[in-house]
Amino acid sequence: MLTETTITKLREMRLSVMANALKDQMADPQFQNMAFEDRLGLLVDAEWNARKNNHLQKLIRQATFSEPGACLENVEYIPDRNLKREDLLRFGTCGYIQEHHNILLLGATGSGKTYLACALGMAAVRQFLTVRYIRLPDLLVDFNIARGNGSIRKLLAQYKKYSLLIIDEWLLYPFEYAGREQTV
């Protein structure tokens, strides 16, 4: 009876993962002989892991990656791509973000620039940094709409909040073609 009340209270406190873990512990006889601190630790770990995972998934969704499955570990180091493993591993630590440096990826169409940019973005997200991926034409459309309805400052403030802003298709098209009509 006391366990059901505790589980109900945990759910009311929005600790549903902990409540489910407690229910599982009560049903599994191997937990009965564990020390209280050990069982409590397992319950807290379950809740903490679920919350961290949910936060990570939210950051991935908010980043709007074109390739959300991209990761630096899967980059192919083909000789004609001139990629250096040590450079990418260093970029994967996201030190350039804390130092407020930029990375510009250059290469022919189809050489993997978008994948690499998304992989760098995923490395940042895995460190719980806020990331936003956007194509330059879409960014320019956003700016033109904001300029038209007077919300340009709000849009700029929104983009300033990200730890990493990935602008894909940078200058792939002339600015006029991409929808740019005035200076930002």
Predicted regions and their residues:
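Short glycine-rich substrate-engagement loop in P-loop NTPases that contacts/grips substrate
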Residues: 81-89, 131-160
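Walker A/P-loop
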Residues: 104-131
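Conserved nucleotide-sensing/catalytic segment adjacent to the nucleotide-binding pocket
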Residues: 150-184
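Charged, compositionally biased N-terminal leader segments and the immediate start
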Residues: 1-20
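Dynamic helix-loop-helix/coil hinge segments at AAA+ ATPase domain boundaries and subdomain interfaces
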Residues: 7-9, 61-84
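Interdomain "pre-motor" coupling segment immediately N-terminal to P-loop NTPase/helicase cores
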Residues: 16-68
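Phosphate-binding P-loop
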Residues: 92-100
